[in-house]
């Protein structure tokens, strides 16, 4: 029984738990600046499309405002419905493009996240960590014996 207890204590002492701030490391990865540029270009194209749509609506609305006094009620009603439809299309386009931008961001981030996860796994295996926890996930207690694996992961990724 004493041998079992000694074995259990020895095994408990071998447990290595690390923590990491993946967001901090991800922002240091060189791929992020290229990703941010691609995303900015993508968002700029979408913004231009929405601005062009909005300008078209404004032009039609201004024309409508100038001419509505001379329009028959049926023509005015048709024009108002067309303007409302254009406004709905603009709102739908905005929502669609916003969802597509989020999807694009996730698509661009995935290879970077995968690379980071692979580096964390490599560090964990090389250094015999039982767990590596995300610091941003809200660890309630962190012992002074807990190891920040950030520097090891940075080294694995070639980040100084």
Regions picked out by a protein language model, each given a short descriptive name:
Residues 1-16:
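Bacterial Sec-dependent N-terminal signal peptides
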Residues 12-160:
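Amphipathic, charged alpha-helical segments and their helix-to-coil junctions
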